Amino acid sequence: MHCPFCRHPDSRVIDSRETDEGQAIRRRRSCPECGRRFTTVETAVLAVVKRSGVSEPFSREKVISGVRRACQGRQVDDDALNLLAQQVEDSVRAAGSPEIPSHEVGLAILGPLRELDEVAYLRFASVYRSFSSAEDFEREIEALRAHRQVPTSS
């Protein structure tokens, strides 16, 4: 790796540690030319393939932005949005594929969002699933009610 200070084409790794709950590796490096130290962070690239076929890196910020629009006017704080984005990223990474269709990202958002805020879930689902009638909303509300009534095992 090039030194960011003197642009020497090599550096030596001094220390490596996992960060971000094992999703990244933080490396402390030293330049043999100028002697300065710097830190790098390595993560595995996860690409999202859009409907058009274009591929772009997965972005937690885009997940948060989309969910924030659905949560507008609701009592949902930034910590909850960040946690949801982390859950979505963990879910899509667990698929084990370096590329994932954007449709799968949307599906990964729905579950955690339903648990976070049902109104925001309905808003997001209505756009994501292209609701076109009141009946679409009614069906989704019935599904929400049924989900609420399923007993959870302790």
UniProtKB/Swiss-Prot annotation:
Query: Which intervals hold the zinc fingers (unnamed)?
Result: 3-34
Example of a GO biological process term: negative regulation of DNA-templated transcription
Q: Which UniProt keywords apply?
A: ATP-binding, DNA-binding, Metal-binding, Nucleotide-binding, Repressor, Transcription, Transcription regulation, Zinc, Zinc-finger
Role description:
Negatively regulates transcription of bacterial ribonucleotide reductase nrd genes and operons by binding to NrdR-boxes.
By sequence similarity, the record places it as follows:
Belongs to the NrdR family.
By its UniProt entry, which HAMAP family does this protein fall under?
NrdR (MF_00440)
Name of protein: Transcriptional repressor NrdR
Q: Which organism is it from?
A: Mycobacterium ulcerans (strain Agy99)
